[in-house]
UniProtKB/Swiss-Prot annotation:
Belongs to the class-II aminoacyl-tRNA synthetase family. It holds the Pfam family tRNA-synt_2. Binds 3 Mg(2+) ions per subunit. GO terms for cellular component: cytosol. The gene is lysS. This is Lysine--tRNA ligase. One of its GO terms (molecular function) is tRNA binding. SUPFAM superfamilies: Class II aaRS and biotin synthetases, Nucleic acid-binding proteins. The lineage of its organism: Bacteria, Pseudomonadati, Pseudomonadota, Gammaproteobacteria, Enterobacterales. InterPro entries: Aa-tRNA-synt_II, aa-tRNA-synth_II, aa-tRNA-synth_II/BPL/LPL, Lys-tRNA-ligase_II, Lys-tRNA-ligase_II_bac/euk, Lys-tRNA-ligase_II_N, Lys-tRNA-synth_II_C, NA-bd_OB-fold.
Length: 504
């Protein structure tokens, strides 16, 4: 049966069920308050299971524990004068035992039996163990708190349709325990990140989301218009330049966890709206960041997952040991063995290598840009184990400090896990004159048609002219980090409401 045929057959059933539920709601309205708000929940299923799952029925009977729970009715088995209900709340599920003779007269037959799966209930009663040993609540009070007008997505198989999972995340969270777990871990990671950063002496700050000049990354921005000021503004592509202004101002260790926006494509690794953590620390260089990153991942995995070994599909990452390190040119030669490392310093030869890989070398690209394109094509997807790639060319690193021994490269790295870039860090460029020259080069590239090239930010150059101490800066993609920690293989699985094309 095609999906169209199946949908056509299901539509009348759904319409009938919607009508039936609306009639039940109408009856509730006639009888009084249809959506009461005087019920107070005192217990969460997860806490009850943690505290009492190991108790015997005799122990529970002796303890005589009264509990009050609230949640969504997920299953119900009516067996004459008694029923079992599965109630789902924020912590998980717990079973209710509902007996006609233990409730006020008329509740069981005239109300409870007419309720539907998906309805939100409040229940009071005593904890006990069933004959099969399942912790349950013997209800002495049961109330309908919210009438669900639409049925649960699937009574038996959960919510499998990916499109629906993303468009109607609330259904996904109701139906799929794994999705709830993913976003619980996400919340824990954000909390742990903040705790880690504060423990290292960093101060959390907030910088503008709308900017007159977008900067801090090579990306196409979203444009909006400020009516009162009558100017175009940009949703930020990165907070970097504002955070470094704060370092100039004397806040020597700052970080921000917030959204960035890039007007680019959607893929399993990209969402136009995404979460980043950026940090800046004065009197440090990129090598200090490497140590910090290794400690950060070691701490997060141990504290949240209970183990520094993280499984991701068929792969396993060990965050308990130092990451591997390679230069960009070393990585190219490793994963394209026929490459002579000396050839990577010859423009004609790198262009030939690029073209042999199907890379269309654009006018205006210099040696460093072509090297970077070759690296992305040949090496990036092979960097499975945690790896730092160092010595990025200055041409593709307009905000990074040049290397003292070789000004063609910068004191910069990107780190990769599972074949994906997770973060980018470098010793910051604090030479105002060099920064002005690099901004001018970015403007030239933009004039030649590169819509990802940076704007010239005169105020930022002015800030550097006041003096910024030696500083190291880092950006980490939080969504990709969450993907690793939750074994999720598309970014949409770790963003509650990912960008979607509108339904027709």
């Amino acid at each position: 049966m095609s999906q169209q045929q199946q949908g056509a057959e299901q539509a009348p059933d759904l319409n009938n069920e919607l009508q039936t539920r609306r009639e039940k709601l109408a009856a509730l309205r006639e009888n009084g308050i249809a959506f009461p708000n005087d019920f107070r929940r005192e217990n969460i299923s997860e806490d009850l299971h943690a505290k009492y799952d190991d108790k015997t029925q005799e122990e529970l009977e002796a303890l005589n524990i009264d509990v009050t729970v609230g949640g969504r009715m997920m299953t119900r088995r009516i067996m004459g004068k008694a029923s079992f209900v599965t109630l789902q709340d924020m912590g998980g599920r717990i079973q209710l035992y509902v007996a006609r003779d233990d409730l006020p007269e008329g509740i069981y037959n005239e109300q409870f039996k007419k309720w539907d799966l998906g309805d939100i209930l409040g229940a009071r009663g005593k904890l006990f163990k069933t004959k099969t040993g399942e912790l349950s609540i013997h209800c002495t009070e049961l109330r309908l708190l919210t009438k669900a007008l639409r049925p649960l997505p699937d009574k038996f198989h959960g919510l499998a349709d990916q499109e629906t999972r993303y468009r109607q995340r609330y259904l996904d969270l109701i139906a799929n325990e794994e999705s709830r777990k993913t976003f619980q871990i996400r919340s824990q990671v954000l909390l742990a990140l903040r705790s880690f950063m504060v423990s290292k002496g960093f101060m959390e700050v907030e910088t503008p989301m709308m900017q007159v000049i977008p900067g801090g990354a090579a990306a196409r921005p979203f444009i909006t218009h400020h009516n009162a000021l009558d100017i175009d503004m940009y949703l930020r592509i990165a907070p970097e330049l504002y955070l470094k202004r704060l370092v100039v101002g004397g806040f020597e260790r700052v970080f921000e966890i917030n959204r960035n926006f890039r007007n680019e494509g959607v893929s399993p690794r990209h969402n136009p709206e995404f979460t980043m953590m950026e940090l800046y620390m004065a009197y440090a260089d990129y090598k200090d960041l490497i140590v910090l990153i290794e400690e950060l991942f070691r701490t997060l995995t141990q504290n949240i997952l209970g183990n520094t070994l993280v499984k991701y599909g068929e792969q396993e990452f060990d965050f308990g040991k130092p990451f591997a390190q390679m230069t960009m040119k070393e990585a190219i030669c490793k994963y394209r063995p026929e490459t002579n490392i000396a050839d990577l310093d010859d423009m004609d030869k790198v262009v030939a290598i690029a073209e042999s890989l199907g890379i269309e070398v654009e006018k205006g690209w210099g040696l460093g840009r072509v090297q970077c394109e070759i690296f992305e094509e040949t090496a990036e997807s092979h960097l499975i184990q945690p790896t730092f790639i160092t010595e990025y060319p200055a041409e593709v690193s307009p905000l990074a400090r040049r290397n003292d021994a070789n000004p063609f490269i910068t004191d910069r790295f990107e780190f990769f896990i599972g074949g994906r870039e997770i973060g980018n860090g470098f010793s910051e460029l604090n030479d105002a004159e060099d920064q002005a020259e690099r901004f001018a080069e970015q403007v030239r590239q933009k004039d030649e048609g590169d819509d990802e090239a940076m704007f010239y930010d005169e105020d930022y150059v002015t800030a550097l002219e006041h003096g910024m101490p030696p500083t190291a800066g880092l950006g980490i993609g939080i969504d990709r980090m969450i993907m690793l920690l939750t074994d999720s293989h598309t970014i949409r699985d770790v963003i509650l409401f990912p960008a979607m094309r509108p339904q027709k």
